[in-house]
């Protein structure tokens, strides 16, 4: 039995969409093991005591509906959970699946010669803040010479859809193409999660990241503000990010091609796995990595 628990406070102002993002985020931990079926979902919910009665009812209903609808899209359903009161809203869940050991991809078997695949672009946190600043003139004036409100809205619309996009296709294809290890990229950024994954490998390996796919325009914003989010250092937090997968290069190219065919979204080879001395496992992002500016699109099926 594999069980994962995750919850957080909203980072978008549409409760229905936030419910979808929360569901996708909870399921990503299962998906990172190559498990693409969730047998049971419990919802964890906090209703805000700092809101008016009307706003609390509206936002809580939206969170529940978004979470439930995305569970249906993922082929599962909410069968219980826990609701509490809290100063700010919280949404998340507990996802459980029962699988055979041979149907799981344990995150420990990367080998020298593997490549690293990333299935979603980086920059969601920058997008969220960028969009919020539209309503905060004192902050917007810091970037008004290099950005427009329309750019902020376009990037944010893409980022929210990316966050809500299920990593389910990636999970299924990991098994099909015999991936060696995987993690999902969330709050610790690509640098933190890749380092944790590298240190968890049975063989002495270094993960070397040479490419960072970033939502178009977010690098410009971060650099203009003195690398406040440290986006090109891989330290910017992500919400419901992509899968970081270690696997043979030929298989990686097949997986990327099929993700693009099925999900209508890009994926990238962003690094490679190298041998190292025992006890020195780590991940490094090369100085001046190649930056891919990922153009926003709305090719989503939800």
For the regions a language model picked out, list residue spans one by one.
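Helix-biased detector of long, well-ordered alpha-helical tracts
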Residues: 1-302
């Amino acid at each position: 039995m594999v069980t994962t628990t995750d919850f957080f406070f909203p980072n978008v102002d549409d409760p229905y969409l936030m419910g979808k993002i929360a569901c996708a985020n909870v399921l990503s931990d299962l998906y990172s093991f190559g498990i693409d079926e969730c047998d049971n979902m419990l919802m964890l919910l906090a209703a805000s005591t700092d809101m008016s009665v009307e706003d609390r009812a509206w936002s809580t209903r939206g969170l529940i509906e978004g979470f439930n609808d995305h569970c249906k899209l993922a082929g599962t359903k909410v069968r219980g959970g826990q609701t509490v009161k809290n100063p700010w809203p919280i949404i998340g869940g507990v996802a459980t699946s029962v699988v055979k050991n041979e149907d799981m991809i344990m995150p420990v078997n990367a080998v020298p010669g593997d490549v690293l695949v990333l299935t979603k672009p980086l920059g969601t946190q920058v997008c969220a803040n960028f969009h919020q600043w539209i309503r905060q003139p004192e902050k917007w004036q810091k970037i008004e010479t290099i950005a427009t409100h329309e750019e902020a809205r376009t990037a944010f619309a893409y980022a929210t859809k990316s966050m809500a996009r299920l990593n389910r296709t990636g999970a299924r294809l990991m098994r099909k193409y015999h991936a060696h290890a995987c993690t999902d990229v969330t709050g610790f950024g690509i640098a933190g999660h890749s380092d944790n994954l590298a240190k968890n490998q049975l063989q002495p390996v270094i993960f070397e990241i040479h490419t960072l796919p970033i939502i178009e325009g977010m690098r410009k914003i971060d650099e203009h503000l003195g690398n406040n989010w440290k986006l090109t250092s891989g330290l910017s937090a992500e919400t419901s990010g992509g899968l970081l997968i270690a696997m043979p290069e030929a298989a990686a190219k097949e997986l990327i091609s099929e993700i693009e065919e099925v999900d209508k979204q890009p994926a990238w080879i962003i690094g490679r796995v190298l041998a190292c001395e025992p006890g020195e496992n780590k991940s490094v992002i090369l100085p001046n990595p190649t930056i891919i500016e990922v153009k926003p699109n709305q090719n989503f099926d939800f």
